[in-house]
Amino acid sequence: MCGIWALFGSDECLSVQCLSAMKIAHRGPDAFRFENVNGFTNCCFGFHRLAVVDQLYGMQPIRVKKFPYLWLCYNGEIYNFKQLQEQFGFEYQTLVDGEVILHLYNRGGIEQTASMLDGVFAFILLDTANRKVFLARDTYGVRPLFKVLTDDGFLGVCSEAKGLINLKHSTSLFPKVEPFLPGHYEVLDLKPSGKVVSVEVVKFHSYKDEPLHAACDTVGNLPSGFDLETVKSNIRVLFENAVRKRLMAHRRIGCLLSGGLDSSLVAAVLLKLMKEMNIKYPLQTFAIGMENSPDLLAARKVAAHIGSEHHEVIFNSEEGIQAVEEVIFSLETYDITTVRASIGMYLVSKYIRKKTDSVVIFSGEGSDELTQGYIYFHKAPSPEEAAEESERLLKELYLFDVLRADRTTAAHGLELRVPFLDHRFTSYYLSLPAELRIPKNGIEKYLLRQSFEDSNLLPKEILWRPKEAFSDGIASVKKSWFSILQDYIDQQVDDLLLEKAAEKYPFNPPRTKESYYYRQIFEKHYPGRSSWLPHYWMPRWVEATDPSARTLKHYKSAIQE
């Protein structure tokens, strides 16, 4: 996890503009650098480093002797950089995984570069020889990227929007800042003046298609066919491979553990592989919740079963409520369920940073979207519509769960790794017949659970534990975290304010006091930027006025039984 920032064609003094880059210093607590581009007094790169791979030679922008005209600033991890070196005979100057981007670009251009990378990334690549600037972001947007581009060619790029919103420019004091779309690259011409012109924005691959880099994957070709045993075996092999490749790190590895299926599978496979690879230190797992919350109790069972060094972070309602404003500032969103779920993740990340030496943190994000884990999937009209909904959720991950996971961990200088969003794993899972992927026997993620049923990785009660939203599982069964928040907020927002909410906030108007409260805080820090959230996250096919799983009938009936 690092923070990247760059300006091209600035009309203002760069030494003043660079102050904006310090707003993302939390993403890279180990070192930072600002560097002007040769021959351009109005172009600059900024970089905040979290040293995870090649701690000695990993500063950016990356430049190598072989390609003196290329400048690279990137945030991410390229898991197949060694395989690509062997495949194409690249001669690396450093041990930095991102150096492969320079070699791939020199060999085949930007489209081949983006398509061949197995990993998570957001990058800015400058080619001064051909006067080109390239931006690119990974398939699911696991690594964030924002940009601002004015009509007269001023370009600003940053890992988080907060590093761009206060930039000054002659034609606009507050230029429009937008997220860069996942799975795309952009080509821009660099003029002698330092200004840029956008040439094209291209989607370089789809999450449904098997990635080009699969050809040199260590797993090789999988057995074909959709009989159940073959499918289950392929799921296990690909998921284990997804975890294995993410073990690439020179810093200590830990794992978030809620006691739910997803994080428990990640932790169990992770610890198994660490033993096989003879990694000497114990795996630290981290659970958070209020006293005796379902997540804490379940996580203890998992930790005892797999033998991890387990840490529990217990918080009370006051601590959670006090964190709301910090969380919204970090998130750069006002989405209801995202804010709720982020508070626990933010607090546990804070604990990890202060109390442990784990820096690379594994988590279970992406599984609910991929494997149809949300409660409302039980109400899908058909397997085909459930499959379409799964794809929609994956497409929008960068607005919700992936955003939450990145910002809450990066706020405390941690790097998150999400094996469920491994591109080869997701493309295979999405290629399966729709009827195989739907909930069965009243149980969501049925196929995923089946695939690991005979592995002994987890206790049976954890493998088949019903879905519970993270923001619900961290509180008690009797009173959920969202109810605690709503009770507090009810005293902070009066009825009259809510009645006039649509007048004050015509875009995505708040319809509840809780929503209004979050929106107020968001507008305080990011006034006029409400379009960053195109819509609120809400379940489909059900009559729901709140995104919490505990408001859904299926959930209530399961609890009563």
Curated annotation (Swiss-Prot):
L-glutamine binds at residues 49-53, 75-77, 97. GO terms for cellular component: cytosol. InterPro entries: Asn_synth_AEB (IPR006426), Asn_synthase (IPR001962), Asn_Synthetase (IPR050795), AsnB_N (IPR033738), GATase_2_dom (IPR017932), Ntn_hydrolases_N (IPR029055), Rossmann-like_a/b/a_fold (IPR014729). The record marks 365 as: Important for beta-aspartyl-AMP intermediate formation. Residues 213-536 form the Asparagine synthetase domain. It catalyses: L-aspartate + L-glutamine + ATP + H2O = L-asparagine + L-glutamate + AMP + diphosphate + H(+). It comes from the Eukaryota. The active site is at residue 2. Pathway: Amino-acid biosynthesis; L-asparagine biosynthesis; L-asparagine from L-aspartate (L-Gln route): step 1/1. GO terms for molecular function: asparagine synthase (glutamine-hydrolyzing) activity; ATP binding. ATP binds at residues 256, 288, 363-364. Residues 2-191 form the Glutamine amidotransferase type-2 domain. PANTHER family: ASPARAGINE SYNTHETASE, ASPARAGINE SYNTHETASE [GLUTAMINE-HYDROLYZING]. This is Asparagine synthetase [glutamine-hydrolyzing]. It comes from Gallus gallus (Chicken). The gene is ASNS.
